[in-house]
Amino acid sequence: MVEDALATEAILEAETILEASDIPLQERLQNLMQYLHDRLPHFHWVGIYWLKGNELVLGPYVGPPTEHMRIPVGRGVCGTAVAENMNQIIEDVRELENYLACNLETRSEIVVLIRCPKSGRILGQIDVDGTEVGAFDESDEAMLEVIAERIARLVV
């Protein structure tokens, strides 16, 4: 859950980071993941997965290492978001049969799709893990949707 003032601050800082055109795009995305991780205490792990064919490929991230460098569409929370064409907010990952454990400390997860601004086609997603049950809600989703839209403008 993120307060309005902090969400606004995060969106403005995300825009500043992403608009630094003198810095390579991948570095800007890594800097953005670092900022979100550091500024939002409930973001234990935050990263981007890019959709390549029928699998998600890990891009820039900050947090504990993960063995999930590639995730098939339909597997876990990330793959389900693509298969169902919708964002996911999972209050307690331990209740999911289809959960791919990236970290034993993870209790909640949010996935927000990154879509092509013109076609709506899925390009990737922002994936965030939290260590508390119920760490994320619609306020996190709304903030991440704005950030995802800003990312999409840079990669299409």
Where are these regions (language model features)?
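Juxtadomain coupling helices with adjacent low-complexity linkers
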Residues: A7, E15-L18, G130-V156
